[in-house]
């Protein structure tokens, strides 16, 4: 529950940071 959320966060925060 929350796999897509975790993936989206990493993709959005990954390149951002």
Swiss-Prot record:
Chief place of localization: secreted
Gene Ontology CC, one term: extracellular region
Keywords, comma-separated and alphabetical: Amidation, Neuropeptide, Secreted
GO BP of this protein: neuropeptide signaling pathway
Tissues where the protein occurs: Expressed in abdominal perisympathetic organs and abdominal ganglia.
Subcellular localization: Secreted
Coiled-coil region(s): none
GO molecular function: neuropeptide hormone activity
Chain positions with Leucine amide modification: 17
PROSITE patterns: PYROKININ (PS00539)
Similarity field: Belongs to the pyrokinin family.
Function field: Myoactive.
Name this protein carries in UniProt: Pyrokinin-5
Classification of source organism: Eukaryota, Metazoa, Ecdysozoa, Arthropoda, Hexapoda
